[in-house]
Swiss-Prot record:
Classification lineage: Bacteria, Pseudomonadati, Pseudomonadota, Betaproteobacteria, Rhodocyclales
Molecular function in Gene Ontology: ATP binding; ATP hydrolysis activity; transmembrane transporter activity
NCBIfam families associated with the record: LolD_lipo_ex
Keyword Transport: yes
SUPFAM superfamilies named in the record: P-loop containing nucleoside triphosphate hydrolases
Pfam families listed in its UniProt record: ABC_tran
Protein known as: Lipoprotein-releasing system ATP-binding protein LolD
Gene Ontology CC terms: plasma membrane
The encoding gene: lolD
Length: 225
């Protein structure tokens, strides 16, 4: 089997405040293979988003470790961690977080421009992937001129434009009606498989989760098949 893209070993998280300790995650073990799609389901408040933040190096576990492309986040300084995360991970959230003053094309090109990719090349790559997600006719439209489903398509395109090793998606269709959610989720699965990108997606929708290669349940802080 190929080397895992992302590995969590014994990951636990305890929130502390006001003299109280609130355990959220306990002994999470997870290994995601290249090109694999993994769905994590669980009730609201079960810690799904917390787990995704830990897997993405956006937060530090109370115990255990998270390794991305062979490097342990805990062994990296803040700058190196950010660079490694930006190089290998893409993120999609329930809310699109597109910048209102920029077009869909400019929003999707933004990660490449931040990396100092030549502007013409960045815009060409953004146009290519927007076309692939069905927005080739909406390149110059701003977020306010797009439907909810179109905004999420643009957010997916932005997350994939820099060819990440793994995509982390937190309820990416949670703000959409059921029909649009099914279409957008199907598109997400299709794009990551075509680009051979690993995907970890958090969702409460079991029907959507069933489209992934593997479905895991998070219950009482424990992740299981």
């Amino acid at each position: 089997m190929s080397e895992s893209i992302l590995i969590a070993r014994g990951v636990s998280k305890v929130f502390r405040g006001g003299g109280l300790e609130v355990p959220v995650l306990s002994g999470i073990d997870l290994a995601v293979q290249p090109g694999e799609t993994v769905a994590i389901i669980g009730a609201s408040g079960s810690g799904k988003s917390t787990l995704l933040h830990l897997l993405g190096g956006l937060d530090t576990p109370s115990a255990g470790s998270v390794t991305l492309m062979g490097r342990d986040f805990s062994a990296l300084g803040e700058v190196d961690r950010g660079d490694w995360r930006n190089r290998h991970l893409g993120f999609v959230y329930q809310f699109h977080h597109l910048l209102a003053e920029f077009s869909a094309l400019e929003n999707v090109a933004m990660p490449l421009l931040i990396r100092r990719t030549e502007r013409h090349a960045a815009l060409a790559k953004a146009a290519e992937i927007l076309t692939a997600v069905g927005l080739g006719h909406r390149l110059e439209h701003r977020p306010g001129e797009l439907s909810g489903g179109e905004r999420q398509r643009a957010a997916i395109a932005r997350a994939l434009v820099s060819d990440p090793s793994c995509l982390l998606a937190d309820e990416p269709t949670g703000n959409l009606d059921s029909h649009t959610a099914s279409v957008v989720f199907g598109l997400l699965i299709e794009r990551v498989r075509q680009q051979q990108v690993s995907l970890i997606v958090v969702t409460h929708d079991q029907q959507l989760a069933a489209k992934a290669d593997r479905v895991l349940n998070l219950n009482d802080g424990i992740l299981c098949e």
